[in-house]
Amino acid sequence: MGKEVFLLDDQGIKRALTRIAHEIIEKNKGAKDIILVGIRTRGVPLAKRLAQRIDQIEGEIVPVGMLDITLYRDDLTKDENDPIVHGSSIDSEINDKIVILVDDVLYTGRTARAALDALVDLGRPKMVQLAVLIDRGHRELPIRADYVGKNVPTSKEEIVRVSLMEIDKKDSVMLEGSKNVV
């Protein structure tokens, strides 16, 4: 069994999100026409935090929605019990808007692909971008994040564990099962 390696604490997460917020504003020449959409579960509080940072920096309130990709996943089988669907909630019109999908960890790209499929069912954005707190590599699909808090090279056996105050009562990112020190 490998070690548990500490990657980010609450201040590290805060700095990463602040940097991503600045990058979003810079790339999109402001915050106009942007909608942040968090992928359930941990993408939602991250999207809300990003919206707060953008408002602090730019003085513009960015709408935040949540996307449930459960029925769009390609790893659900007919043999599984009924999946729990929480539903999506995007109160703003996404047509002709810049939608930034927000998630905690980018790994194979399959979650991002499912989110794109779910998003297209809700409308036709002008552009879709992807923001992630952690990019751990090992893509199985041609997907990359536009905004990354931290790149963490991992083995496929390792697990990146993101804990957020809103869900887990603490902010941290840990690498579990590591044989090396990061």
Curated annotation (Swiss-Prot):
User: A Pfam family matched by this chain, by name?
Assistant: Pribosyltran
EC number, UniProt record: 2.4.2.9
**GO-annotated biological processes:** DNA-templated transcription termination
**Record function comment:** Regulates transcriptional attenuation of the pyrimidine nucleotide (pyr) operon by binding in a uridine-dependent manner to specific sites on pyr mRNA. This disrupts an antiterminator hairpin in the RNA and favors formation of a downstream transcription terminator, leading to a reduced expression of downstream genes. Also displays a weak uracil phosphoribosyltransferase activity which is not physiologically significant.
Which family would the database say this protein is a member of?
A: Belongs to the purine/pyrimidine phosphoribosyltransferase family. PyrR subfamily.
The annotated subunit structure for this chain is: Homodimer and homohexamer; in equilibrium.
Designated name of the protein: Bifunctional protein PyrR
Q: What's the gene?
A: pyrR
